[in-house]
């Protein structure tokens, strides 16, 4: 069984199952699994704060707990929520296109797991989500 990172201890059960799936079934490295967790934790912190703006300031974005996220809340995620999240990442967190693209990939994989692999969700709300364009640099 894949070793669970202490980073993941404050996640909700569905996310814990997904991270276990990535490590044991998909064979992802512990570091890769941790990166998925960090990407998804940031999204669900944003998701909660977007529903309750007071959370952005009190106790602070980095302190928002996600251990109480439910399947119903996950099912309520819309493509518009994710577009707003991408804007938040670019404007407030100063994430470049490559970082945002990785977060899109994490979200896609998570929602595919919930719809295709487990059948917990009937519809994938981010199926039409596009990956941010990454500028190609010229060779040096």
Question: What are these model-derived regions, one by one?
Answer:
Residues 2-5, 16-31, 40-138:
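N-terminal core-binding DNA-recognition domain of tyrosine recombinases/integrases
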Residues 6-10:
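A detector for short, charged/polar N-terminal pre-domain segments
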Residues 13:
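Gly/serine-rich nucleotide phosphate-binding loop at the start of the catalytic core
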């Amino acid at each position: 069984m894949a070793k669970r990172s202490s980073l993941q201890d404050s996640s909700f059960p569905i996310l814990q199952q997904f991270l276990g799936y990535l490590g044991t079934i998909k064979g992802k490295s512990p570091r890769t699994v941790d990166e998925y967790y960090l990407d998804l934790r940031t999204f669900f912190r944003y998701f909660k704060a977007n529903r309750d703006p007071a959370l952005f300031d009190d106790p602070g974005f980095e302190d928002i707990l996600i251990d109480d996220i439910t399947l119903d809340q996950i099912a309520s995620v819309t493509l518009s929520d994710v577009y707003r999240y991408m804007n938040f990442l670019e404007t407030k967190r100063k994430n470049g296109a490559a970082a945002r693209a990785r977060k899109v990939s994490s979200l896609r994989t998570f929602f595919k797991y919930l719809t295709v692999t487990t059948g917990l969700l009937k519809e994938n709300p981010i199926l039409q989500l596009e990956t941010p364009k990454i500028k190609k640099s010229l060779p040096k």
